[in-house]
Structure formats: C-alpha cells, structure tokens
C-alpha cells in the first residue's frame, strides 16, 4: 500500500521531458552551478503546488520511520520502476537553489524548504543506496536554506532597513584602526550588498507569507534534527561546520519566552520555537556519533563566542557590534545558559574547551563599556562551572593577561575582577596547588589586579581601576563589602577603617608597603615607576587625585569618598581637605564629582563635624562658579541637604538624621563659617526667582525661632526675607521686643533679626516702624550694642526711614533727624577723650571703639551733617603714634610721601585697636569727602610703612584699595607702596594685599605699570604655600583671562628683572625704591630655583603661538645682545644667560603640539576624540616644521656664536648652553646636520665638544655614586667645609685652550664673591648630572691654622683632576706651616692676608682650576699634546722658567713624579712665557683656505696655566 501511494506521488517528479543530460550535469558540477530547468517541467511538477512536496513527503515518511514494514524496500521499488534517486536529488536541488536567491518569492522559498526536507528524508531512509544520495554540497545547501530562506530584516520598513545597513557599515568603519584604509575588497562587498538590497527591496512579504516561511523552516529543522542521530557526520567536517554556523544563527531567530533547558528540547513534539530547536541541534552535534567531542564543541564555542559578545553572527559577518537591545541581551543569556548546561552534562571533558572560550572572550570583547560589562558577567557565570583547580589556572592566566601591552585587555581584566568580587569567595581546595591557592581569594583581585592597574601608565586603565575600587566599596552585597574592607584593614592600607557595625578599627597609622616587600621588583612595562612607599593604597590614591588626566582624578575622588565613609575622619583630615579642595578643580567634571562626593560623604557621616565643615567650605562657594552646570550642581546639593530637610518644629525628631544634619550645617554657617554667608545670598537670589520658598516653608522656618535652633533659623530667615518677604510679622515683632529688652542678647541672633526687620520694614505698620526706630536709636546713643551689631542697626535704620518716607528728600530728612543725635553723641564722647587733659587716662577702650565705629557708619548715611571737627578728631587718633618718633622713614616712598608729616602730631598714644578702627572710619569719611582724601592718602601710605601693628596695616591696605576705586588717579601713584606689602612680614597682610590687588586689576582700576607685575608674580615663590597657591590662582584663572597676553608681554623683562640686570637699554628701567628692591630681590644662585619656578609657571600658561614667539624674542633680545657685543660679558651676564638657557631647555617652552603625545587610549564612545587626534597629528606636523625651520635659520647661528663668546670669556653659563645644545641636537639632529653641511669642520668640532661634555657628565655621576658608596658612617655627621664645583672649563671639549681656561677661573671667583655675596651663606642645591646647575664658582672658607684643609663630600661631583689638586694642597699645607708667597699672575686677582677669607677663596679656586688641566687623567683636545708641558711645583720663593718639553730616562722620570704634589706659581712681575708652537698643519690650510675669526679664536695657541 505504501509503495502504491509512493508511485502515485512520484509521478510529478518523473516528468517525461526531463533531460538526463541536465541531471548528469548537475551531479558532474557537484551542485555548484545549476543550469535553469525547463519551465514546462517546473510547471508540470508544481501543477498541484505545494501538494507535490507534501504528498511525496507523506509517502516517503513511513519508509524513514520503518512504519512500512521490512518486507517493502523503497530502493527496490526505485530500481524496478526505473526511478533514479539522482534525478530526484537534482530536482530537489533546483528548488533549493531558487530559494537561496534574495529575489525569490515567498512561494518559491517555501518550495525550497520542502525540497530540502525531502532530501533529508531520503537520507533518513535506511538502505545501502543512501551513500549515493548524499552529496556534501547539496547537504550544505539544504542546511543553509534554513537561514537564507528567511527574508533579511523583514520586520523593518524598507527605509529603516536601508538606514540600519548604512549605520552598521559606518559603525564598522569607525571601529577600524585609525590610519588603516579599508581594503578594495570591502568596497566591492559593499557594492554587492547594496545591489542585493536593491533587489530585495522589490520583494514584499505579507504577514501570512512570513508565517508560512517560518512554519516551513520550523518543520524542516525538526525533520533535520530527527535525521542527525541516525546520520553520522563523522567524516564530513565541512558539513558539521555548516550545521554549527546555521544553528548558531538560528539561535537568535526568535526569542524564547521561558527558561530554556536542553533536556526539554529532546522531545521535539513539545518544542515550539526555532531557537530551541537550534540549540538542540547544537547539542546533538556534540554526540560522539559525529566525531571527536572536543573538536565539535570547540567549533560550537567558537561560533557562540559572537553571540556571547553581542557581535554580528553569520556567514560573511564582519563581527561588528550589535546595538544592545533586550533581544540581543536575551540571546546572549541563552547562549551562556546553553554553554553552562553543556558543561554541566559533559563535566571534565569539556573544561579545556571552556577555558579556551573564556580566553577568547577576554581577547575579542568589544572595547566599549557596556559590551565589556556584559562580557565580564558572561565570563564569570561560565567560570563558576569550573572546579577550583581549573578556576585557579584560569585566574593565573587572567593575572598575566592584566599585564598585556594592549590597553583594552588591561581594562577588561578590571571588569572581570570586579565581577568576580560579587561572587562568594571560594574555599581552599586540596586539589589546588599551594602556589595557586592565592588565586581563589578576593584579596588577590583587589591587591594584585585592581591595585596594580591603579599604577598603570595609561590613564584610561588608571581611571577604570579606581572606579573599580569605588564600586568594590559601594557593593550592595554586605558580605562582599565587608570582605573588601577586611582586605584594607589587614593590609594596613588605610588607617582607621570602620566596619559595617560602625566600630572603628585602627591598625597601624603608618602607611607601610603592603606585604612588606619593595615595590621596585613589581614594576612592569605598563606600570608607572613606583617608589617603595607608593605601594600603599592611600599614597597611590593621593597621587592619582593629582593626576593630569581628568577621568583619573574623578575616579580617585570617588574612591576617596568611599574610603572616608568607612574611616575615622579624625585620622584622615588631610584627605578630607583634598576632597574639599577639588571643588575648585580646573576641570568641570571633576568639580561636579567633588561636589557629589562631599554630599554623599556628609550624608553617610551626618554627625561628623569635620565632614560638615568640609562640605560647607567645598560646596557653598561653588554657587559663584563661572560654569553654569557646576553652579546648578552646587545649588542642587544645597537644596538637597538644607532646604528639603526643613520641616515644622513639631515634626522635628532628633532621630531623623537628615533634619539634624540640616540644622547642624546651618548652625555652623551661623557661628563658625560666617564668611560663607555671602555666597548664600547668590543661592537664595537664584532660588527666589524660581519661587522656591513657599509660605509653608517660611512658616516652618519661623516655627524654629523660639527653639534652641533660633540662631540658624533667624539666619535662614534673613536670607529668605531678602527676596520673599511674605512672613508672619506678628511672630517676628514679638521675638524682637523680647530680645531687644535683654541686657546681653545673643549678637548673632539679634543681628539676623535686625536684618529681617530691615527687609520687611515696608510691610510693617507705621507705629511699629517708629517704635523699632526709637529702640535702635536709643541703643546706638547709649553704645549698648557690640560693634558686630552696629552695622546691622544702621542698615535697619536706613530701611525703616526709607519705608516711612515717600520721597528721597523725605528719607534724607528722616535720616538726619535720627542720625543727627547719634552723630552728636559720638562727637561729644570723642571730644571728651581727645581734647581734655585727662581724657585718655580714664577712657573705656571698648566704648571708644563702638563710638568710632558708629560714627563711621552714620557718616556714610548722612555725609552732609558731618562737620570738619569730626575729621580732626579721627585724625588726632591716628596722629598719636607710639612709634612714629623712632621708626626710620622709608627710602622707597615718593618725595611727597617723605615730606608727609603724621596726621596732626599729638603726644598721647592710642592703643592699636582704636587706631585700627579709626583708620576704617577715616576711610569711610574719605569716600564722602574728596578734600579729606587728598590729605589722608599720603599719611595712610606712610602709616602702612612705619606701623608695626598687623591690624593697622591691614586696615590701611583695605582703605587705600577702596579709595582707589573712588579716587583712581589719586591713589595710582601709591600702588608701588601697596605692592610692597606683598612681601610683608605677616602672611595675613601678604594674602590680603594679593586679594585686594587682584580685585583692582580685574576691574582695571589699577594697570600693570612699573614693577607691579614682577612683584605680583613673586608671590608664586612665597614662603607660605597657601599664598603661593593663591597667587597661582589669581594670575592664571582671574587676571590672565582678562589679559591673555599679559604673561607674554612681561616675560623677557622678567628675566632681566629677577636677575637685577640693569645694563640693557630697554628692559628693567622703571624706578624702584631701595627698600622695594631688597624685599623682592631674587638674584643670585640661591634664588635660582625660585626664578625658574616663576619662569615655568608663566610658560605653562602660554599659547603655542606665544611659546614660538617668545623663543625668538629671547634669542634676539637677550642672546643676540651678547653675541653682538651690545651687552658686556661679565658675571652678571653669566647669571642672566644661565637663566636664559635653562628656560630654553625647559619642557614648558616646547610647543604643546610637539610635546603632547597622541592619546592611544581614547574613551570608548568618544568618536569626536578620535577626530581630534587626527587633527592634532596634522597640526603637530605643520607646527613642527615651522618650529624647526625657525630654529635652524634664526636660533642655531646665535647659539653657535654665543658658544664661542662664552668659551673665549670663560663664562660659567657655558655649562647651561651645552645642556641646551645637547637637547636641541637630539630634537633637531637631521636639521642641524643639514645646517652644518656647508661647514663640516665646524660640525665635527661641535660633535666632539658634545661628546666630551657627555663624558664629563658621566664621569661626574660615576664619582658621585662612588663617593656615596664609599662614604663612612662618620662622614654623615660632618659639616662640609668646602663645596667644590664641577670642572667645566677644564674639559678640552669646551675650550681649545684648557690651561688658559683654568687661568680664568680665579677672576670669576673673585667677581662672583663681589657680585653675589648673598650666596655665600646658603649652600647650593644639589644638582643632577643630566641637568646641572650653574654653581660654577666654589665658596671656600679660610684654611685652618690648626690642621690641613679637609675636603668633604660636596653637593656636586668632583672630577679626577679636582681631587688630585686638592690632595696636593692638603699635603703641602700639612707639611709647611709657613706663609706662602704668590707670584705674578697673568690676570688680576686681589691678594690678601691668610686671615682674609676672600684671599683664600680666590687662591684656592685658582689652584683647583689650574691643576685640573695639568692632571693626566683629563682628556685632551684635538690639538692638545698628551703630556703636560712641564712639571709644576708648589713651594715658596721658586720662580718659573718655561722650557721645552724634555724626554727623561726612567730614573729621572720617577724622580720627577716624586714631586708631583708641588705646585709652582710665577712671580707677579713676570709675564708668562709662550708655549712652543706645534708643528701641525690643517689640510684645509694647505689649500689656502682661511678659517673664520671666530674659529681662530677658539683654536688659539696654548697658554701656560700660571
């Protein structure tokens, strides 16, 4: 029966007109190329449509499932009826191939799926002929139709599909490595895909079509899975690979709504989703039937990798990242779940393959934050399936991976470590080796992976590591959080950490290196060089907080906040201050992070007063930030902690931490941090515009005025009423009446109350206003209130009078009426004290202060009623100076100031506190009366210089600066006197002057004239670090913004000014007083570091254009002046040139475009940053070429010429020139070679000079190291008796005549001693060989008569020749205790007695320098003989006679060497003999060429050293 049905259903598939040749061709071509089938035959087959496939399938199905019985054989039936299986397969292939086309209709796609199902059914039928039916290409096509028959992205509109394709390609191109253009093949593939898309756009699929195709795919897949267990693919690896690719692609075909388990998919009849069938197909492929397990599983995992990493999957896929949607995430979760199930079932056999998968996840994860996070979660989830031994092995590999040279690898390791920390810690297992047991502990992830990455050289990695630390400490799992804290505690990483039970754990406060070993052995190529102490967590964190990269600082602040949450704040107040200071960080995002961190910290520790104060000092001033987003963040933090927690006092609960915190903060603002209240005015003004203060809120504040929180409540009301005066006035007036009657009211509360009354005055009834006015007037008349309340009282009086008056004139009349009596009382009281004989003897100091203060405030309100008598009274107070008689007059004042007498001389002496208040009052009077100001300003300036009282000087500065706004021209002449206060002995005065001058300069009341700029920038090197920091802020962030060229315009003159060089015709020519010069003196070697700090600060804030121009200006205005002989070459010039070359050699003067490294670790999602890098590289190339051209054409010629001049004059600045020349020869080697191409001899000389100079530096460094290594313990307690400068001039590479060079050392020493005596008492700072200082001239004390001179270890290394000559001097002095006589020298040296230290300094300098050149160790120049000209002795009364070099026998030579420690000097009346000329001819001269005068000067004949 089955065979009969089969015969009927096979009829359409056995058309009579079918060409056997066509069938043969299909098989011969291995199904790769199929010729079109005759349409009539196709029509004959499809006459019944889909039934042709389904009926044949129904007929064949019983034979595949053995339902037809064993008596019937389909293959026998085929043979008997002459039915060819090859023909059937060829016809099936035709329909399969048609369905593969993108232009295929829904019907043909369905036909193709059915045809593939018939082919699989033939393979399923048992029998020997099955091997003839199978063909690998046909098999693969039938499998691939499962994927290709489904219309691509059919659920999208055509436009959306086109846009997505374009976007996907764009994203792929963006993800390509920069600088690597797409290949030609990529463009060709793009063209093909574009054509295919256009073809596909013409096809429309209805919902019904899609459902039919989906059902056909489902049925075909189910049938194929029924075939897989029966049909082995063991010998068909390509078919297995095709199956895996198709199955993996189908896993994301449709979502699986329920939790997927492989065991459920084994019953195919119960499976409803294609994705489930695909996973079951992958599971079936893992059967031993299809080959070696691990190979197949490895291929499956390889394909599943893209699903897990959320990349494109499929044939021809470029593995571009997919948009992260819920469907993509679900596919990832299902893939991880499948791999986990497979590992659970196969156990140990699959562990190696799983390890490979985990490694590939690490290596191929997309370098974007979200992809990394999901990949790390997947990896950790799979890692839990491994037993401890394999787990530890993988962690060991991960640890090595964390030290990869690629930044994305190191970043992803941190994601993995963070994910692993969320898991419970594994217990130790006996199967794990001892060396691998550490990998099971959380401590390893924290200390060995995350901590080490905090020291990474890449800022992206450092930032990620710090963020990981912060996340560790904020983990929601209490167990994990405790374990992290436990790691810190046990490692002594952080002092005073609190555990979660709020108990304070205080390990050793000493921050030691963790694990007790040195960090130097742990450094890696990807890590920064760390010192032994930097392995401590807090040391590292403090360094990261100062990191140059913004994201690193942000992350470090997060970590610091997390640490402080769990710490004893009292032991970490310095770190709390760091968090506070970063609210003013230059970077906007860092400021926001600091605000957020401080807010979170104060909410975590609401009862900690230091944290509360830090929050106030950090957050409140930021409401004035110039960046609106930062300002909004600060307002948000204030609103969150202050306003939102203010409730009615009936709802106040001490257990409510937020309410308690709000009132605690307000109380601190009221009492301790009153200076911050001015910033609150800005905040409340902004809030009032937003209608922030409702009547409910205001009434809630008022309800606290009668509680213990009254002072902060009144303070808050004073801010609110300024903008929202809708208050319950009755309650306020009642409180006023009660408090005003008290004998000693609280000053703070009463002051705020007066402020509130002033704001609501216009809303009060007239009777109430008059009553309050009377009370205030009476209190002022009786001086019953403290000075703190006087200003508030006067302000309240003014507002009350304004509220009572209808016009301005009426207001003035009321003020005169009210204030006139108070003013008269003050005048009478002062007259009684100052004009009566015994007035000062019985005066009440506090009462006088109140009187003076009241008078000043009243005078400002009513200047018309103030009589001249009041002026005289105030002036008489100031005239009574207790120190005006004995203090010398300042030398730095103008003639008018010198002749200015004290205000009005008087014999009485007033206390300083009264004089200080009198100055403030005088300033208020001067603001209203110009004539008084003209008389008072010179006297005030005089007082500024002679007064010893800090309060008096401070008030004088404030008054003069205020008067500068009112009378700018009048005060302008005295700005130099004010700027002198920048060097006042008191730090407070210096800081006050700095702030006031900054304000005046910002508003342009004061101009940068004369010495003001140079005095202002000298604050950068103030001895007080806070003042230096404030100076930096004022200059860089306030003043430079108003005048961007300010630094550039003054830079050249800075070099002259700070070296006190006044020989230039243009620079440093402004007038200065001697006192000012001495106060701001920065010349000399001792101040070299300070000067360089100023120069570098200015250069750091130059633009690249300014750096380029200032380099040229330095060469033209400084260096060229010396090469052209405009300026004299002397010791003053040496200091100036030394500074100049150090500036040119500094990294700060190099163009940013040239010294900035292209960022290799851009932020992941920042495509704009990538474009910026490309622009930066192009800009750098252009600027570099311009800079190099300018350098070669304009700078190098000047440098070379100046080198010759310095060598000729033996100037110590030659050392700095050589340093600079060495650097530029490295930076511009090719350009310099081109420059010297025309003068190869000069080039060889310069190269030789540099070689010898480098050798000398290396020799000095070696000697220093040797001296440090051999120095005995007793040497450390000795005080060095001599500081020996390095031997610069003795090196033949720097001078053609080395002995003449040594001879020039003594006048330099003498000149230095005369010009820079301020350096004698200060030891020179230690210098490094790579960047030596210009400490050329040694300073030696006189030789002791009791013993030989002892040379101790100096701060600078000594050459071998120096050591030799000093040893000779020591021996000579020890053996001959008698007076030495000096012969005539070929240059002028001041001689003196042995008791004169300067005499010894000069002579010893001479001896030291001269012997350096004689010593045989010294390297010789090109034209210098190897042996010395003659032996030199050191003895009295022996004259020198020059003789030609003589060759001795061995005995005579040994005899000569016995006296080698004797030095002989010529007599004063003798001229040194000329040395013999060397018979050496230059090849260049032999051809008649003449050398330049400059070169002939360099190669002068040798002179004798004496």
From Swiss-Prot:
The modification Phosphoserine is found at residues 562, 1359, 1368, 1381, 1393. Component of the condensin-2 complex, which contains the SMC2 and SMC4 heterodimer, and 3 non SMC subunits that probably regulate the complex: NCAPH2, NCAPD3 and NCAPG2. SUPFAM superfamilies: ARM repeat. Pfam families: Cnd1 (PF12717). Residues 1213-1270 form a coiled coil. The gene is Ncapd3. HEAT repeats lie at residues 442-476, 532-567, 574-605, 968-1004. Its main location: nucleus. GO terms for biological process: cell division; meiotic chromosome separation; mitotic chromosome condensation; positive regulation of chromosome condensation; positive regulation of chromosome segregation; positive regulation of chromosome separation. Residues 154-194, 884-908, 1317-1353, 1385-1412, 1473-1506 are annotated as: Disordered. This is Condensin-2 complex subunit D3. GO terms for cellular component: condensed chromosome; condensed nuclear chromosome; condensin complex; germinal vesicle; kinetochore. Keywords: Cell cycle, Cell division, Coiled coil, DNA condensation, Mitosis, Nucleus, Phosphoprotein, Repeat. Residues 1393-1405 have a biased composition (Low complexity). The keyword Repeat applies.
């Amino acid at each position: 029966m089955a065979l009969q049905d089969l015969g009927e259903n096979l009829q359409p598939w056995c058309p009579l007109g079918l060409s056997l040749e066509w069938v043969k061709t299909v098989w011969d071509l291995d199904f790769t190329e199929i010729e079109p089938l005759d349409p009539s035959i196709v029509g004959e087959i499809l006459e019944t449509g889909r039934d042709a496939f389904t009926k044949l399938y129904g007929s064949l199905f019983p034979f595949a499932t053995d339902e037809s019985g064993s008596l019937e054989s389909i293959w026998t039936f085929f043979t008997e009826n002459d039915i060819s299986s090859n023909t059937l397969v060829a016809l099936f292939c035709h329909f399969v191939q048609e369905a593969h086309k993108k232009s295929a209709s829904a019907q043909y796609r369905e036909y193709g799926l059915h045809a593939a199902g018939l082919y699989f059914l033939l393979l399923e039928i048992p029998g020997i002929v099955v091997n003839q039916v199978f063909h690998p290409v046909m098999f693969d096509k039938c499998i691939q139709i499962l994927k290709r028959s489904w219309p691509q992205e059919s659920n999208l509109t055509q436009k959306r599909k086109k846009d997505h394709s374009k976007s996907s390609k764009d994203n792929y191109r963006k993800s390509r490595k920069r600088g690597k253009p797409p290949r030609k093949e990529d463009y060709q593939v793009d063209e093909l895909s574009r054509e295919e898309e256009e073809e596909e756009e013409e096809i429309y699929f209805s919902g019904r079509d899609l459902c039919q195709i989906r059902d056909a795919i489902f049925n075909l897949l189910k049938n194929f899975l029924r075939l897989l267990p029966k049909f082995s693919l063991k010998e068909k690896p390509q078919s297995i690979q095709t199956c895996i690719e198709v199955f993996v692609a189908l896993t994301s075909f449709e979502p699986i709504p329920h939790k997927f388990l492989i065991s459920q998919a084994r019953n195919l009849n119960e499976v409803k989703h294609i994705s489930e069938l695909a996973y079951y197909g992958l599971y079936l492929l893992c059967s031993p039937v299809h080959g070696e397990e691990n190979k197949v599983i490895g291929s499956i995992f390889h394909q599943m990798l893209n699903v897990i990493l959320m990349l494109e999957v499929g044939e021809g896929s470029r593995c571009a990242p997919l948009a992260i949607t819920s469907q993509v995430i679900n596919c990832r979760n299902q893939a991880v779940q499948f791999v986990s199930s497979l590992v659970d079932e196969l156990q140990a056999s699959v562990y190696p393959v799983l390890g490979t998968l985990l490694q590939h996840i690490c290596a191929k994860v997309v370098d974007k934050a979200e992809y990394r996070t999901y990949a790390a979660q997947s990896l950790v989830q799979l890692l839990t399936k491994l037993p401890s031994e394999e787990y530890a092995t993988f962690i060991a590999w991960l640890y090595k991976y964390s030290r990869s040279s690629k930044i994305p690898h190191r970043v992803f390791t941190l994601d993995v470590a963070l994910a692993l920390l969320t898991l419970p810690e594994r217990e130790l297992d006996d199967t794990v080796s001892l060396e691998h047991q550490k990998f099971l502990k959380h401590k390893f992830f924290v200390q060995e992976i995350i901590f080490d990455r905090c020291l990474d050289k890449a800022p992206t990695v450092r930032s990620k590591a710090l963020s990981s630390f912060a996340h560790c400490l904020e983990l929601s799992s209490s167990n994990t959080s405790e374990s992290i804290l436990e790691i810190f505690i046990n490692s002594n990483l952080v002092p005073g950490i609190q555990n979660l039970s709020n108990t304070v754990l205080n390990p050793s406060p000493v921050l030691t290196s963790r694990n007790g070993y040195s960090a130097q052995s742990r450094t890696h190529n990807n890590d920064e060089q760390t010192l032994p102490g930097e392995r401590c967590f807090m040391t590292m964190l403090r360094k990261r907080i100062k990191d140059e990269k913004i994201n690193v600082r942000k992350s470090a602040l997060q970590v610091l906040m997390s640490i402080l949450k769990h710490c004893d704040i009292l032991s970490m107040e310095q770190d709390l201050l760091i968090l506070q200071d970063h609210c003013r960080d230059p970077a906007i995002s860092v400021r926001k992070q600091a605000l957020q961190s401080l807010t979170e910290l104060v909410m975590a520790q609401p009862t900690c007063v230091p944290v509360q104060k830090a929050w106030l000092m950090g957050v409140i001033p930021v409401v004035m930030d110039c960046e609106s987003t930062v300002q909004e963040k600060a307002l948000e933090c204030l609103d969150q902690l202050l306003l939102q927690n203010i409730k009615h006092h009936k709802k106040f609960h001490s257990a409510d931490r937020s309410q308690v915190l709000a009132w605690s903060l307000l109380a601190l603002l009221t009492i301790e941090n009153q200076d911050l209240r001015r910033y609150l005015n800005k905040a409340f003004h902004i809030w009032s515009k937003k209608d922030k203060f409702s009547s409910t809120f205001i009434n809630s504040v008022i309800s606290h005025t009668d509680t213990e929180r009254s002072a902060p409540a009144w303070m808050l009301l004073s801010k609110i009423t300024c903008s929202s005066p809708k208050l319950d006035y009755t309650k306020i007036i009642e409180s006023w009446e009660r408090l005003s009657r008290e004998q000693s009211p609280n000053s703070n509360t009463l002051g705020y109350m007066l402020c509130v009354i002033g704001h609501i005055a216009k809303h009060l009834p007239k009777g109430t206003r008059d009553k309050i006015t009377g009370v205030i007037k009476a209190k002022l008349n009786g001086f019953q209130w403290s000075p703190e309340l006087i200003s508030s009282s006067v302000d309240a009086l003014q507002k009350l009078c304004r509220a009572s008056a209808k016009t301005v004139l009426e207001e003035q009349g009321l003020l005169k009426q009210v204030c006139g009596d108070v003013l008269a009382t003050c005048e009478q009281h002062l007259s009684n004290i100052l004009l009566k004989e015994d007035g000062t003897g019985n005066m009440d100091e506090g009462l006088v202060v109140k009187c003076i203060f009241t008078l000043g405030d009243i005078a400002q309100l009513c200047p018309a009623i103030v009589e001249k008598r009041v002026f005289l009274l105030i002036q008489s107070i100031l005239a009574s100076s207790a120190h005006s008689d004995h203090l010398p007059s300042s030398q730095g004042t103008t003639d008018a100031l010198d002749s200015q007498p004290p205000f009005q001389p008087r014999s009485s002496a007033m206390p300083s506190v009264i004089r200080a208040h009198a100055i403030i009052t005088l300033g208020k009077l001067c603001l209203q009366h110009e004539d008084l100001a003209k008389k008072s300003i010179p006297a005030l300036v005089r007082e500024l210089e002679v007064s010893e009282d800090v309060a008096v000087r401070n008030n004088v500065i404030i008054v003069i600066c205020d008067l500068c706004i009112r009378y700018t021209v009048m005060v302008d002449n005295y700005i130099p006197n004010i700027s002198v206060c920048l060097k006042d002995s008191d730090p407070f005065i210096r800081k006050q002057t700095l702030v006031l001058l900054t304000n005046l300069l910002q508003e342009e009341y004061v101009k940068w004239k004369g010495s003001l700029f140079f005095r202002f920038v000298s604050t950068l090197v103030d001895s007080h670090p806070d003042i230096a920091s404030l100076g930096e802020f004022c200059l860089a962030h306030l003043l430079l913004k108003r005048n961007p060229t300010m630094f550039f315009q003054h830079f050249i003159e800075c070099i002259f000014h700070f070296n006190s060089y006044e020989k230039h015709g243009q620079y440093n020519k402004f007038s200065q007083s001697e006192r000012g010069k001495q106060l701001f003196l920065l010349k000399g070697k001792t101040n070299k570091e300070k000067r360089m700090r100023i120069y570098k600060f200015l250069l750091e804030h130059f633009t690249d254009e300014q750096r380029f121009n200032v380099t040229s200006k330095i060469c033209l205005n400084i260096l060229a002046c010396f090469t052209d002989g405009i300026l004299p070459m002397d010791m003053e010039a040496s200091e100036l040139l030394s500074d100049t070359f150090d500036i040119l050699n500094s990294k700060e003067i190099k163009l940013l475009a040239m010294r900035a490294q292209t960022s290799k670790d851009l932020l992941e999602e920042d495509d704009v940053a990538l474009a910026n890098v490309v622009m930066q590289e192009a800009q750098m190339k252009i600027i570099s070429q311009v800079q190099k051209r300018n350098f070669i054409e304009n700078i190098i010629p000047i440098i070379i010429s100046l080198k010759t001049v310095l060598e000729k004059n033996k100037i110590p600045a030659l050392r700095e020139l050589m340093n600079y020349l060495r650097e530029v020869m490295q930076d511009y080697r090719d350009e310099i070679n081109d420059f010297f191409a025309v003068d190869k001899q000069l080039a060889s000389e310069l190269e030789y000079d540099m070689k010898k100079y480098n050798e000398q530096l290396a020799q000095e460094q070696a000697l220093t190291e040797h001296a440090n290594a051999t120095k005995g313990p007793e040497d450390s307690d000795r005080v060095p008796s001599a500081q020996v400068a390095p031997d610069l001039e003795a090196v033949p590479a720097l001078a053609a005549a080395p002995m003449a060079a040594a001879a020039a050392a003594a006048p330099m020493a003498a000149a230095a001693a005369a010009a820079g005596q301020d350096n004698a008492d200060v030891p020179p700072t230690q210098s490094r060989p790579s960047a030596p200082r210009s400490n050329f001239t040694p300073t030696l004390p006189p030789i002791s008569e009791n013993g030989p001179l002892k040379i101790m270890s100096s701060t600078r290394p000594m050459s071998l020749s120096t050591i030799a000559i000093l040893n000779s001097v020591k021996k000579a002095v020890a053996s001959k205790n008698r007076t030495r006589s000096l012969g005539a020298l070929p240059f002028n040296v001041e001689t003196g007695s042995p008791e004169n230290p300067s005499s010894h300094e000069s002579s010893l300098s001479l001896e030291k320098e001269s012997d350096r050149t004689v010593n045989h160790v010294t390297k010789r120049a090109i034209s210098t003989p190897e042996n010395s000209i003659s032996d030199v002795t050191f003895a009295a009364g022996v004259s020198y006679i020059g003789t030609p070099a003589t060759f001795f026998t061995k005995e005579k030579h040994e005899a000569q060497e016995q006296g080698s420690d004797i030095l002989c000097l010529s007599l004063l009346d003798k001229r040194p003999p000329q040395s013999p000329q060397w018979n050496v001819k230059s090849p260049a001269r032999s051809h008649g060429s003449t050398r330049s005068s400059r070169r002939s000067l360099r190669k002068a004949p040798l002179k004798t050293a004496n």
